[in-house]
């Protein structure tokens, strides 16, 4: 895992077209802005896990 230190207004670049910028820091909460192409999905981890779980569950609809 790469660990970086950034200040408000500073960014991290991933490849040529993804930018993550620190927008604010308040206590233990950090607000990030993500700029990425539309074809790149960006989710919070807990949302991604929920999406993944939903895809893995068998369909139980009536026939």
From Swiss-Prot:
Signal peptide: none annotated. It comes from the Bacteria. It is found in: Cytoplasm. The keyword Cytoplasm applies. One of its GO terms (cellular component) is cytosol. Its main location: cytoplasm. GO terms for biological process: mRNA catabolic process; negative regulation of translational initiation; positive regulation of translational initiation; regulation of carbohydrate metabolic process. GO terms for molecular function: mRNA 5'-UTR binding. Keywords: Activator, Cytoplasm, Repressor, RNA-binding, Translation regulation. A key translational regulator that binds mRNA to regulate translation initiation and/or mRNA stability. Mediates global changes in gene expression, shifting from rapid growth to stress survival by linking envelope stress, the stringent response and the catabolite repression systems. Usually binds in the 5'-UTR; binding at or near the Shine-Dalgarno sequence prevents ribosome-binding, repressing translation, binding elsewhere in the 5'-UTR can activate translation and/or stabilize the mRNA. Its function is antagonized by small RNA(s). Homodimer; the beta-strands of each monomer intercalate to form a hydrophobic core, while the alpha-helices form wings that extend away from the core. PANTHER family: CARBON STORAGE REGULATOR. Belongs to the CsrA/RsmA family. This is Translational regulator CsrA. It comes from Haemophilus influenzae (strain ATCC 51907 / DSM 11121 / KW20 / Rd). The gene is csrA.
């Amino acid at each position: 895992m790469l660990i970086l230190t950034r200040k408000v207004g500073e960014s991290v670049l991933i490849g040529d077209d993804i930018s993550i910028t620190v927008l604010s820091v308040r206590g233990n909460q950090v607000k990030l802005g993500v700029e990425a192409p539309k074809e790149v999905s960006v989710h919070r981890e807990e949302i991604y896990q929920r999406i993944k779980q939903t895809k893995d569950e068998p369909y139980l609809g009536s026939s």
